[in-house]
C-alpha cells in the first residue's frame, strides 16, 4: 500500500493559489556535451561519473581537447524547470548569468520553452558559467564545471515574490559550494514556508554531498519537505553502506524522499513506509545526463497536480526515460504527449 503523504508536504490551507507550480534555484550554466572514449577520461585525469569544479584555464583546455560538441543552456535545476514546462506545468527559474553571449543564450532558451527566468544582478567581471560533459560509451556522464558568475548567487539575487508564488521551491545542491549560496537557500526556504509553500532539495552529486555533508543534513532537517537523490548520494549523506540503511536514516529526517536507482527504478520514502516504482523501459540508453533532473520534473509535476506518490514516481520515470534515450539533458519531445 502506498504510504500517505506527510502533512509537511501539503501546502498550508492559508496559502494563496500559486502562479507557478515549481520555482527552481540553481547554477545557470551552458552545457557543452561531447562523446569520448574512456581513454579520454584517463588522459585528462577525469573520474568517471563525477562532477568536478574547474577554473578558467582547465575549462579552456578541456573544451579544446573535446573537439566537436553540442552546446545548449543547462544546469541541473534549469533542466528540471524545462521538464516541468514540457509536461505542461508552470515553472520559474532563478539563476545568475552575465551580460554576455552565453548569458543571452541561456535566458532566451528558458523563455523559448515557457520557463519564466528571474536572473540575479549580473557581474561585469565574471562570465556566464558552463559545464563540460563527457559522455562515455556506457552512457555515463562525467562533468567538469566552470561555475563563473552562477556561483556568485546570494540572497540579494532572489526574486522573493516569485518564490512566494510557487507551489514548490526546488533547490539545486550543486549551488552549495559557497557560503553565500547556502545563506540564499536558507532565505529562500524561509520565504517559501512563510507563504505556505513547500521546499524541495536535490542532492545533485555524491562528491558535493561529501564536501558539505553537515550543512546538507542541517538543511534537510530544518527546511526541506521533499528530498531528491540517487543511491550514491543517499549513501554519502548518511555515511552508510546499504540503501536500506540510508532509507531508514532519511525517513527520520525528511517527510518525503524520492531515491532514484537507475534501471532498478526509484523508491518513494515517507515516515509510513517505502514503495518501489519500476523504471520506464528504454530501448537504448544513449546519455544519462539530466536523468535525475527530469525525474524530479515529473515527480514534482505530479505532486503539484494532485497525483498519488506512486504516480508521481511514474511520471518521473517517464520523463527520465525520454531524456536518456538521446544526447542532452532536455527533452526532445513534449513530455505532455507521453503521459
Model regions and ranges:
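Hydrophobic beta-strand scaffold residues
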Residues: 91, 117, 199-200, 257
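Conserved phosphate-binding/catalytic region of the ribokinase-like
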Residues: 2-23, 28-29, 42-48, 65, ...
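A glycine-rich helix N-cap at a beta->alpha junction
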Residues: 109-126
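A short, aliphatic-rich alpha-helical micro-motif
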Residues: 17, 160-164, 220-221, 251
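Glycine-rich phosphate/adenosyl-contacting loop at the front of the ribokinase-like
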Residues: 1-94, 104-105
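Conserved phosphate-binding/catalytic loop of the ribokinase/pfkB sugar-kinase fold
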Residues: 118-122, 133-179
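Conserved beta-alpha-beta core of the PfkB/ribokinase-like small-molecule kinase fold
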Residues: 168-248, 264-266
Amino acid at each position: 500500500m502506498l504510504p500517505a503523504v506527510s502533512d509537511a508536504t501539503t501546502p498550508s490551507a492559508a496559502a494563496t493559489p500559486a502562479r507557478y507550480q515549481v520555482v527552481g534555484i540553481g547554477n545557470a550554466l551552458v552545457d557543452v556535451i561531447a562523446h569520448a572514449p574512456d581513454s579520454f577520461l584517463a588522459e585528462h585525469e577525469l573520474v568517471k561519473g563525477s562532477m568536478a569544479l574547474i577554473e578558467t584555464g582547465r575549462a579552456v583546455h578541456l573544451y579544446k581537447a573535446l573537439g566537436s560538441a553540442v552546446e545548449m543552456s543547462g544546469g541541473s535545476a534549469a533542466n528540471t524547470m524545462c521538464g516541468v514546462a514540457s509536461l505542461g506545468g508552470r515553472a520559474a527559474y532563478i539563476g545568475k548569468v552575465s551580460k554576455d553571449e552565453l548569458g543571452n543564450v541561456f535566458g532566451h532558451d528558458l523563455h523559448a520553452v515557457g520557463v519564466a527566468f528571474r536572473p540575479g544582478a549580473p557581474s561585469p567581471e565574471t562570465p556566464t558559467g558552463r559545464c563540460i560533459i563527457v559522455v562515455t560509451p556506457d552512457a555515463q556522464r562525467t562533468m567538469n564545471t566552470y561555475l563563473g558568475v552562477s556561483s556568485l548567487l546570494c540572497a540579494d539575487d532572489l526574486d522573493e515574490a516569485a518564490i512566494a508564488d510557487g507551489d514548490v521551491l526546488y533547490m539545486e545542491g550543486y549551488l552549495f559550494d559557497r557560503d553565500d549560496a547556502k545563506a540564499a537557500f536558507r532565505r529562500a526556504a524561509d520565504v517559501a514556508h512563510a507563504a505556505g509553500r513547500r521546499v524541495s532539495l536535490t542532492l545533485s552529486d555524491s562528491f558535493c554531498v561529501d564536501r558539505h555533508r553537515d550543512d546538507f543534513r542541517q538543511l534537510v532537517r530544518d527546511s526541506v519537505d521533499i528530498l531528491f537523490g540517487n543511491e550514491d548520494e543517499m549513501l554519502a549523506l548518511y555515511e552508510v553502506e546499504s540503501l536500506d540503511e540510508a532509507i531508514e536514516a532519511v525517513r527520520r529526517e525528511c517527510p518525503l524522499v524520492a531515491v532514484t536507482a537507475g534501471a532498478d527504478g526509484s523508491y518513494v520514502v515517507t515516515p509510513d513506509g517505502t514503495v518501489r516504482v519500476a523504471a520506464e523501459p528504454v530501448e537504448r540508453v544513449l546519455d544519462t545526463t539530466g536523468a535525475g533532473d527530469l525525474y524530479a520534473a515529473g515527480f514534482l509535476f505530479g505532486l503539484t497536480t494532485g497525483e498519488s506518490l506512486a504516480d508521481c514516481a511514474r511520471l518521473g520515470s517517464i520523463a527520465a526515460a525520454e531524456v536518456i534515450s538521446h544526447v542532452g539533458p532536455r527533452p526532445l519531445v513534449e513530455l505532455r504527449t507521453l503521459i
